[in-house]
């Protein structure tokens, strides 16, 4: 029987044009503040990219492989519930404690939060910066 290497390769590495367009959007629109990077997807962006909020959050690790960032996030708008979902990932920074302050939680290096307004994003970033600064001092 054996393993079909070609099929395995395709399953692991082949991507769609939609993946390319989404990744391009993220690279063109991400923001940064110190060791933190994030992208924001409004309902309009999600519609234009033909994706759900869940799919929007699933691209969070597009920003994972940059050495300058120890925390990276996906912020997606939820107009229906009038809030913003934040997926937070990190390399060595316990982000779940910060996520818990914003109606969320999760694992130490992979957590989620819910913001009632984009103004809260600034506060979330400041709390994450405090965590990062505590590690690097």
Functional labels for PLM-detected ranges:
Residues 1-137:
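Hydrophobic helix-and-loop "lid/oligomerization" segment in the mid-to-C-terminal part
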